[in-house]
């Protein structure tokens, strides 16, 4: 398999993904910002039709370098949408050997997925 390239909107930070419910106990639920991002990302994935990947991969995530924030806080959002839409079976180490993330001159977010090599 060659490399699979997927375009996504700029991912939300892990700090923006969930909000705490008021009241007794500690209940978390998806934030409106995360729900909106998930909807937009899902629509983009549906138009790109990436294949389902059932083997171990390395994932490279390129973020729009005109944006601000911590790159590492955006990995979970990207992996979760890939699993939710069935592109990845799971994001456990059995299926995802390595992730890398950085800032590049791209629009939104570009995800490159390739078969992991044994080292």
Question: How would you describe each model-predicted region?
Answer:
Residues 1-119:
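Acidic, proline/glycine-enriched N-terminal capping motif
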């Amino acid at each position: 398999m060659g490399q699979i390239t997927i375009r996504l909107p700029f991912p939300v930070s892990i700090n923006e993904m969930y909000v705490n419910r008021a009241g007794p106990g500690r209940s978390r639920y998806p934030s409106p910002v995360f729900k909106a991002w998930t909807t937009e990302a899902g629509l983009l994935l549906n138009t790109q039709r990436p294949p389902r990947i059932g083997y171990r991969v390395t994932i490279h995530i390129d973020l729009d370098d005109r944006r601000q924030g911590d790159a590492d806080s955006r990995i979970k959002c990207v992996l979760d949408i890939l699993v939710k839409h069935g592109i990845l079976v799971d994001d456990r180490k059995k299926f995802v050997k390595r992730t890398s993330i950085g800032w590049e001159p791209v629009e939104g977010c570009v995800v490159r997925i390739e078969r992991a090599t044994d080292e």
